[in-house]
Curated annotation (Swiss-Prot):
Keywords: Cell cycle, Cell division, Coiled coil, Golgi apparatus, GTP-binding, Membrane, Nucleotide-binding. The lineage of its organism: Eukaryota, Metazoa, Ecdysozoa, Nematoda, Chromadorea. Expressed in germ cells. It is found in: Cytoplasmic granule; Golgi apparatus membrane. Its main location: cytoplasm. Disruption phenotype: Viable. Disrupted localization of rab-11.1 and prolonged cytokinesis in embryos. Double knockout with rei-2 results in a smaller brood size, weak embryonic lethality, enhanced mislocalization of rab-11.1 and prolonged cytokinesis in embryos. It comes from the Eukaryota. It comes from Caenorhabditis elegans. This is Guanine nucleotide exchange factor rei-1. GO terms for biological process: cell division; intracellular signal transduction; protein localization to Golgi membrane. The keyword Protease does not apply.
Amino acid sequence: MTEGDDQLISIRKQLENLNNATDDINSYEMKLETVKKQFCETQLMFNKEMLGIPKKLAKHISKSRQFFDLKSRESEIRRCVQQAAAQFERQKTSVEMAREQVQILHNSLNNNQELDAEKQYVDVIEQQLELVKEAEGECLKAEKCHASRVRDLLQLEMALRKCLEENGSAIKKSRPYYERKEVLTRTMNSQLELMSILEHEVQERKDSYSDSMRALEQISDQIHQERSSQSSLAPSSDAESDSS
Protein backbone atom coordinates (compact mmCIF):
# COMPACT_ATOMS: atom_id res chain seq x y z
CA MET A 1 0.00 0.00 0.00
CA THR A 2 1.45 3.37 -1.07
CA GLU A 3 1.56 6.56 0.95
CA GLY A 4 -1.13 7.99 -1.31
CA ASP A 5 -3.40 5.08 -0.45
CA ASP A 6 -2.85 5.68 3.28
CA GLN A 7 -3.73 9.33 2.83
CA LEU A 8 -6.88 8.45 0.92
CA ILE A 9 -7.97 6.06 3.69
CA SER A 10 -7.29 8.75 6.31
CA ILE A 11 -9.29 11.30 4.33
CA ARG A 12 -12.25 8.96 4.03
CA LYS A 13 -12.07 8.17 7.75
CA GLN A 14 -12.01 11.83 8.76
CA LEU A 15 -14.85 12.69 6.36
CA GLU A 16 -16.89 9.89 7.90
CA ASN A 17 -16.11 11.27 11.37
CA LEU A 18 -17.23 14.71 10.22
CA ASN A 19 -20.52 13.38 8.91
CA ASN A 20 -21.17 11.39 12.10
CA ALA A 21 -20.28 14.35 14.30
CA THR A 22 -22.55 16.64 12.27
CA ASP A 23 -25.48 14.21 12.55
CA ASP A 24 -24.91 13.80 16.29
CA ILE A 25 -24.62 17.55 16.86
CA ASN A 26 -27.91 18.17 15.05
CA SER A 27 -29.63 15.35 16.95
CA TYR A 28 -28.41 16.42 20.39
CA GLU A 29 -29.12 20.10 19.73
CA MET A 30 -32.70 19.25 18.75
CA LYS A 31 -33.11 17.25 21.96
CA LEU A 32 -31.55 20.09 23.94
CA GLU A 33 -33.96 22.64 22.47
CA THR A 34 -36.88 20.37 23.33
CA VAL A 35 -35.75 20.01 26.95
CA LYS A 36 -35.13 23.76 27.24
CA LYS A 37 -38.65 24.41 26.01
CA GLN A 38 -40.06 21.89 28.50
CA PHE A 39 -38.06 23.50 31.30
CA CYS A 40 -39.41 26.96 30.46
CA GLU A 41 -42.96 25.58 30.41
CA THR A 42 -42.46 23.90 33.80
CA GLN A 43 -40.93 27.08 35.20
CA LEU A 44 -43.90 29.16 34.02
CA MET A 45 -46.26 26.61 35.55
CA PHE A 46 -44.30 26.72 38.81
CA ASN A 47 -44.44 30.53 39.01
CA LYS A 48 -48.13 30.59 38.14
CA GLU A 49 -49.15 27.93 40.67
CA MET A 50 -46.79 28.87 43.49
CA LEU A 51 -47.31 32.63 43.35
CA GLY A 52 -51.01 32.72 42.53
CA ILE A 53 -52.30 31.47 45.88
CA PRO A 54 -55.10 32.98 48.01
CA LYS A 55 -54.09 35.05 51.04
CA LYS A 56 -55.85 32.67 53.43
CA LEU A 57 -53.89 29.69 52.11
CA ALA A 58 -50.69 31.75 52.18
CA LYS A 59 -51.04 32.06 55.97
CA HIS A 60 -51.31 28.28 56.34
CA ILE A 61 -48.33 27.82 54.02
CA SER A 62 -46.24 30.19 56.13
CA LYS A 63 -47.16 28.44 59.38
CA SER A 64 -46.39 24.97 58.02
CA ARG A 65 -43.16 25.85 56.18
CA GLN A 66 -40.91 24.60 58.99
CA PHE A 67 -42.66 21.21 59.01
CA PHE A 68 -42.24 20.64 55.29
CA ASP A 69 -38.65 21.92 55.31
CA LEU A 70 -37.87 19.34 57.99
CA LYS A 71 -39.84 16.69 56.13
CA SER A 72 -37.78 17.27 52.99
CA ARG A 73 -34.62 16.33 54.96
CA GLU A 74 -36.08 13.20 56.52
CA SER A 75 -35.29 10.71 53.73
CA GLU A 76 -31.66 11.88 53.49
CA ILE A 77 -31.16 11.62 57.26
CA ARG A 78 -32.68 8.13 57.30
CA ARG A 79 -30.37 7.13 54.46
CA CYS A 80 -27.37 8.39 56.46
CA VAL A 81 -28.53 6.37 59.47
CA GLN A 82 -28.77 3.22 57.35
CA GLN A 83 -25.32 3.80 55.84
CA ALA A 84 -23.78 4.41 59.27
CA ALA A 85 -25.43 1.26 60.63
CA ALA A 86 -24.11 -0.81 57.73
CA GLN A 87 -20.60 0.60 58.21
CA PHE A 88 -20.75 -0.16 61.94
CA GLU A 89 -21.74 -3.78 61.21
CA ARG A 90 -18.86 -4.12 58.72
CA GLN A 91 -16.38 -2.82 61.28
CA LYS A 92 -17.70 -5.19 63.95
CA THR A 93 -17.20 -8.07 61.55
CA SER A 94 -13.63 -6.91 60.87
CA VAL A 95 -12.90 -6.86 64.60
CA GLU A 96 -14.31 -10.36 65.05
CA MET A 97 -12.25 -11.71 62.15
CA ALA A 98 -9.06 -10.07 63.45
CA ARG A 99 -9.63 -11.54 66.92
CA GLU A 100 -10.28 -14.98 65.42
CA GLN A 101 -6.94 -14.80 63.62
CA VAL A 102 -5.19 -14.08 66.93
CA GLN A 103 -6.91 -17.08 68.52
CA ILE A 104 -5.90 -19.30 65.60
CA LEU A 105 -2.28 -18.20 65.97
CA HIS A 106 -2.35 -18.89 69.73
CA ASN A 107 -3.81 -22.36 69.12
CA SER A 108 -1.15 -23.08 66.51
CA LEU A 109 1.57 -21.98 68.92
CA ASN A 110 0.20 -24.18 71.73
CA ASN A 111 0.06 -27.20 69.43
CA ASN A 112 3.56 -26.65 68.07
CA GLN A 113 6.17 -28.81 69.85
CA GLU A 114 9.24 -27.16 68.29
CA LEU A 115 11.63 -25.49 70.74
CA ASP A 116 11.81 -22.21 68.82
CA ALA A 117 8.08 -22.13 68.02
CA GLU A 118 7.43 -19.14 70.28
CA LYS A 119 10.08 -17.07 68.48
CA GLN A 120 8.46 -17.91 65.15
CA TYR A 121 4.98 -16.92 66.28
CA VAL A 122 5.60 -13.93 68.54
CA ASP A 123 6.15 -11.38 65.75
CA VAL A 124 3.15 -12.60 63.78
CA ILE A 125 0.92 -12.52 66.86
CA GLU A 126 2.06 -8.99 67.72
CA GLN A 127 1.31 -7.83 64.18
CA GLN A 128 -2.13 -9.41 64.34
CA LEU A 129 -2.79 -7.76 67.72
CA GLU A 130 -1.99 -4.40 66.09
CA LEU A 131 -4.54 -5.19 63.39
CA VAL A 132 -7.08 -5.98 66.11
CA LYS A 133 -6.34 -2.64 67.77
CA GLU A 134 -6.76 -0.77 64.47
CA ALA A 135 -10.01 -2.60 63.71
CA GLU A 136 -11.35 -1.79 67.18
CA GLY A 137 -10.49 1.88 66.65
CA GLU A 138 -12.33 1.97 63.33
CA CYS A 139 -15.25 0.15 64.91
CA LEU A 140 -15.45 2.72 67.70
CA LYS A 141 -15.48 5.57 65.18
CA ALA A 142 -18.22 3.83 63.18
CA GLU A 143 -20.25 3.32 66.36
CA LYS A 144 -19.98 7.00 67.29
CA CYS A 145 -20.93 8.03 63.76
CA HIS A 146 -23.99 5.77 63.85
CA ALA A 147 -25.02 7.13 67.25
CA SER A 148 -24.68 10.69 65.94
CA ARG A 149 -26.84 9.93 62.90
CA VAL A 150 -29.48 8.30 65.11
CA ARG A 151 -29.53 11.42 67.32
CA ASP A 152 -30.05 13.58 64.24
CA LEU A 153 -33.01 11.44 63.22
CA LEU A 154 -34.54 11.47 66.70
CA GLN A 155 -34.21 15.26 66.89
CA LEU A 156 -35.86 15.58 63.49
CA GLU A 157 -38.75 13.33 64.51
CA MET A 158 -39.25 15.34 67.72
CA ALA A 159 -39.29 18.59 65.74
CA LEU A 160 -41.83 17.14 63.28
CA ARG A 161 -44.11 16.03 66.12
CA LYS A 162 -43.89 19.48 67.70
CA CYS A 163 -44.81 21.13 64.40
CA LEU A 164 -47.79 18.81 64.02
CA GLU A 165 -48.98 19.60 67.53
CA GLU A 166 -48.68 23.36 67.03
CA ASN A 167 -49.81 23.71 63.40
CA GLY A 168 -51.58 20.48 62.50
CA SER A 169 -54.50 22.21 60.79
CA ALA A 170 -52.29 24.52 58.73
CA ILE A 171 -50.08 21.58 57.71
CA LYS A 172 -53.08 19.59 56.53
CA LYS A 173 -54.49 22.48 54.49
CA SER A 174 -51.15 23.42 52.89
CA ARG A 175 -49.97 19.86 52.17
CA PRO A 176 -51.26 19.86 48.53
CA TYR A 177 -49.30 23.08 47.89
CA TYR A 178 -46.03 21.64 49.20
CA GLU A 179 -46.51 18.30 47.46
CA ARG A 180 -47.15 20.08 44.16
CA LYS A 181 -44.13 22.31 44.75
CA GLU A 182 -41.96 19.25 45.35
CA VAL A 183 -43.17 17.60 42.13
CA LEU A 184 -42.49 20.69 40.02
CA THR A 185 -39.12 21.30 41.67
CA ARG A 186 -38.08 17.70 41.09
CA THR A 187 -39.21 17.96 37.46
CA MET A 188 -37.21 21.15 36.89
CA ASN A 189 -34.12 19.66 38.53
CA SER A 190 -34.37 16.61 36.27
CA GLN A 191 -34.73 18.84 33.23
CA LEU A 192 -31.72 20.92 34.26
CA GLU A 193 -29.68 17.76 34.75
CA LEU A 194 -30.70 16.47 31.31
CA MET A 195 -29.85 19.84 29.75
CA SER A 196 -26.38 19.65 31.28
CA ILE A 197 -25.87 16.13 29.91
CA LEU A 198 -27.02 17.13 26.41
CA GLU A 199 -24.84 20.26 26.42
CA HIS A 200 -21.87 18.06 27.31
CA GLU A 201 -22.71 15.66 24.48
CA VAL A 202 -23.00 18.53 21.99
CA GLN A 203 -19.64 19.93 23.07
CA GLU A 204 -17.98 16.51 22.78
CA ARG A 205 -19.28 16.11 19.21
CA LYS A 206 -18.15 19.63 18.32
CA ASP A 207 -14.69 18.83 19.67
CA SER A 208 -14.67 15.65 17.58
CA TYR A 209 -15.69 17.68 14.52
CA SER A 210 -12.85 20.15 15.14
CA ASP A 211 -10.34 17.29 15.58
CA SER A 212 -11.38 15.78 12.24
CA MET A 213 -11.13 19.17 10.51
CA ARG A 214 -7.60 19.66 11.86
CA ALA A 215 -6.66 16.14 10.75
CA LEU A 216 -7.93 16.88 7.22
CA GLU A 217 -5.97 20.15 7.16
CA GLN A 218 -2.80 18.29 8.18
CA ILE A 219 -3.33 15.70 5.44
CA SER A 220 -3.95 18.49 2.93
CA ASP A 221 -0.76 20.29 3.99
CA GLN A 222 1.19 17.05 3.73
CA ILE A 223 -0.10 16.39 0.20
CA HIS A 224 0.71 19.97 -0.81
CA GLN A 225 4.27 19.67 0.53
CA GLU A 226 4.81 16.39 -1.29
CA ARG A 227 3.59 17.85 -4.57
CA SER A 228 5.78 20.91 -4.10
CA SER A 229 8.79 18.68 -3.49
CA GLN A 230 8.03 16.64 -6.60
CA SER A 231 7.65 19.81 -8.68
CA SER A 232 10.99 21.18 -7.50
CA LEU A 233 12.73 17.93 -8.43
CA ALA A 234 11.19 17.73 -11.91
CA PRO A 235 13.29 20.51 -13.67
CA SER A 236 16.58 19.10 -12.42
CA SER A 237 15.61 15.66 -13.70
CA ASP A 238 14.77 17.10 -17.14
CA ALA A 239 18.09 18.94 -17.24
CA GLU A 240 20.00 15.78 -16.49
CA SER A 241 18.17 14.00 -19.32
CA ASP A 242 19.06 16.79 -21.83
CA SER A 243 22.74 16.81 -20.89
CA SER A 244 23.02 13.09 -21.39
